[in-house]
Amino acid sequence: MDIKSALSRIVGHLDLSTEEMRDVMRQIMTGQCSEAQIGAFLMGMRMKSESIDEIVGAVSVMRELADKVELKSLDGVVDIVGTGGDGANIFNVSTASAFVIAAAGCTVAKHGNRAVSGKSGSADLLEAAGIYLNLTPVQVARCIDSLGIGFMFAQTHHSAMKHAAGPRRDLGLRTLFNMLGPLTNPAGVKHQVVGVFTQALCRPLAEVLQRLGSKHVLVVHSKDGLDEFSLAAPTFVAELKNDQITEYWVEPEDLGMKSQSLHGLAVEGPQASLELIRDALGRRKTENGQKAAEMIVLNAGAALYAADHAMTLAQGVELAHDVLHTGLAWEKLQELGAFTAVFKVENEA
């Protein structure tokens, strides 16, 4: 199916099949469509609402075209990532959590990008921390296999996305592509925590990942609007495990945490986010640093559970708490900085 035929279908509020969506996405991602066609397609999809078949088709093409990271094993390798777009502008919780997860002995293949709508994306934060981002897939694999953690910069691994960049920027609205990033990890991880900007996406994205072969995934959205587990409100979870999807609410108290306001956790940019994370992963000298630490523990614990590194959510949170207080997570961040600095010298020689 070509994009003109797809537009005719979408105008009539008719869904595309998975194969039809694959055809259209392949045309978009290989530069065969005009910016006007891409913009119209994205807006039409949003107005119609994307079906599970359509998302599966789009994700499968993005995965095919990605510059993949080949790891020695995917057993228990986890990603913790969000769609963004929640408007809260709190510090980089999932990126900070990744270092706690790795310090707990669980392998992390972190996928992320620069900020689109927020103040600090995962790439912005890591760059502020002195971590070199422009790695080849082989270099990323060496980080992950050697240190237990590595970062895959989305724009490096999904270069075909450049064809949709202009229309996405000009539209200035959430589109299909906002939900594709967390579903297209270049290492092909089977364990994830995926935060989404609306509860309505939790079950559908769990079903998408089920169809694409994921093993254990938590798709989450908190009642206060965050695309991650929140200290301030219940969090809705669609959990894929043993090829079954279950849905439930989790209160912070269910996991041994105290409910509290998120006041003081919003940041104006990556440097402010880094300073808060340094406090949270270090001595927690400030009230906000302590609160940030608890937010990190909550989300890192969920990822340890998704990775099957803990038997229950509560056990994952307890393990994350113990690890954070050792200071090993901050050391892991510094290790990654030193490791990638060697690659920077190699790449720029």
UniProtKB/Swiss-Prot annotation:
**Biochemical pathway:** Amino-acid biosynthesis; L-tryptophan biosynthesis; L-tryptophan from chorismate: step 2/5
Q: How does it assemble?
A: Homodimer.
Know the name of this protein? Anthranilate phosphoribosyltransferase
What gene is behind this protein?
A: trpD
Question: What cofactor does this one take?
Answer: Mg(2+)
Recall the GO molecular function terms of this protein's record: anthranilate phosphoribosyltransferase activity; magnesium ion binding
The alphabetical list of record keywords is: Amino-acid biosynthesis, Aromatic amino acid biosynthesis, Glycosyltransferase, Magnesium, Metal-binding, Transferase, Tryptophan biosynthesis
Supply the EC number(s).
Answer: 2.4.2.18
Q: Where does anthranilate 1 bind?
A: G82, N113
Bound how, and how many: what does the cofactor note say?
Binds 2 magnesium ions per monomer.
What would be one Gene Ontology cellular-component term for the protein?
cytosol
- May I ask which residue range the UniProt record assigns to the signal sequence? none
Q: What does this protein do?
A: Catalyzes the transfer of the phosphoribosyl group of 5-phosphorylribose-1-pyrophosphate (PRPP) to anthranilate to yield N-(5'-phosphoribosyl)-anthranilate (PRA).
Upper taxonomic lineage:
Bacteria, Pseudomonadati, Pseudomonadota, Gammaproteobacteria, Pseudomonadales
Q: What residues does Mg(2+) 1 bind to? A: S94, E228
One GO term under biological process is:
L-tryptophan biosynthetic process
Return the Gene3D superfamilies for the record: Nucleoside phosphorylase/phosphoribosyltransferase catalytic domain, Transferase, Pyrimidine Nucleoside Phosphorylase, Chain C
Read off the SUPFAM superfamilies from this record: Nucleoside phosphorylase/phosphoribosyltransferase catalytic domain, Nucleoside phosphorylase/phosphoribosyltransferase N-terminal domain
Binding residues for 5-phospho-alpha-D-ribose 1-diphosphate: 82, 85-86, 92-95, 110-118, 122
Family (UniProt): Belongs to the anthranilate phosphoribosyltransferase family.
